[in-house]
Amino acid sequence: MNSILAIKNIIIESLSQALEKARQEGQIPALSVDISIEHPQKTNYGDYATSLPLRLAKATGKRPMELAEILAGYIEPGEGIAKVSVAPPGFINFTFSKEWLCNLVKTILGEAESYGNINMGGGSRVQIEFVSANPTGPIHIGHGRGAVLGSTLSNVLKAAGYYVEEEFYINDAGSQIDAFKRTLFARYQQALGKEAAVPQDGYHGQYMVELAAEMVAKYGDKYLQMPLEIAQNDLGEIGMARMLCLISDDLKSLKVDFDVWFSERSLYSGGQYKTAMDILLANNYIAERDNATWFSSTLLGDSKDNVIVRSDGTPTYFASDIAYHYNKFIERKFDRVINIWGADHQGHVSRMKAMLSALGINPERLTTLLFQMITLKRGGELVRLSKRTGEMISLSEVIEEVGADACRFFFLSRSTESQMDFDLELAKKESAENPVYYVQYAHARICSILSLAKEKGLSYSGGDTALLGEEAELELIRKMAELPEIVETVARTLEPHHLTYYAQELANAFHQFYKDCRVISDNTELSSARLKLVDASRIVLARTLHLMGMTSPQSM
């Protein structure tokens, strides 16, 4: 019984059985209750605790402490549990046995890189779509936060037993693409000394000037020799492909890769758009009025109907969304879809659910995560513009300044619905004040200890972990034990910020152990046991960093 999740289930089952025994003895009435346990803030209250007696006191007519004593009396400490106790004002506490904790070190060493994996998903197919920035310009730090959220959740869901595909949706069919093409051609003409005006609805950033210069360097005046419409379209297609390459490069520098880059255009050329519209029409969710085509989402509880085809015959962005989600659920048969969008998409969530219902798809299969934006600071001062371009600071500039690992950790460090400040100066500090440095330094320190042991010719493969018993040793093991539970929590809540908190707590537990316990000493048997603990902590910390998409440095 080496998994903390197994121990957790045993505790919950023992509480359920205790309730039933108390009912059979006439001490409490029949009750229907969800049993939950959690880690107390202080380990002297045990490793798990439940407030069940406090919640049931009124229903049973008993004082919480009295009820706690009754239930605890029916619980026998099982495998892995050394003690069951009660504490005011009505908690039941469970304490792990030292034997279980010491054996866990061997379990971690045996499972190695698979430690922390659980079979929550059972191979269920999940698609996560994130970033999906328009291919009309560089990506910014807001896109970066969405990218890190998506890739980290993918890592965690895979560790939790799901089959996961990561997808970037290319918005290559809307009016913004036409504006991009017209802008690029105007800049191309200007680069060749021709007079041309950038369209008012175009893209006015310096990057378009640079992109046009690239086109001139590669193609000369080739596109001035063609009919305007053909030249503008063909050059625009090349420019858009180049923009996608730059976006992909920026994301790769953040350690974000996609399994699929999905073109919006393919929904129309591949027939999914027509098929999805036919389904809505057959189900009476399409209405024609004001020379436009509407999706009757109010029939499904939405606050208003939504235009899907404008009066000029062009589909709206929502029309593409309908076809895209038809493709995800019906054609590609994903069991669950997770969309990670910026908070400015809040208004789209309810109509997406309505649209799925209209297509005959259970809307609960779609989860939309909305994340807040990031405020960049430098030593407390707001950073608004790039020093290099004088425009909005790009993701690539931030990565270049502080590194991908710092970006990933800070982007993950707050819950998705929380706005966050990202202090560039803090992210570069080489001190415990910087959580990225603090966590990665713990891993480097571990590697240094193991390297020293190797230099001294110390083998610890036969080390006896039963010799471990110091408070700092057991606290470190307790924290290491939590990784499968953290994976389960993040996979269930889709809130990866729990990983950053856990990483800091784990690093802190290791640093405290290092301070309190001399690893390599004249006592070779104890040294071997502690080296086993150090190696196991390396595995758990590296796994945690891997789940966050970060590196595990061997030296710093």
Curated annotation (Swiss-Prot):
It comes from Dehalococcoides mccartyi (strain ATCC BAA-2266 / KCTC 15142 / 195). This is Arginine--tRNA ligase. PROSITE patterns: AA_TRNA_LIGASE_I. The keyword Membrane does not apply. It catalyses: tRNA(Arg) + L-arginine + ATP = L-arginyl-tRNA(Arg) + AMP + diphosphate. InterPro entries: aa-tRNA-synth_I_CS, Arg-tRNA-ligase, Arg-tRNA-synth_N, Arg-tRNA-synth_N_sf, ArgRS_core, DALR_anticod-bd, Rossmann-like_a/b/a_fold, tRNAsynth_Ia_anticodon-bd. GO terms for cellular component: cytoplasm. Monomer.
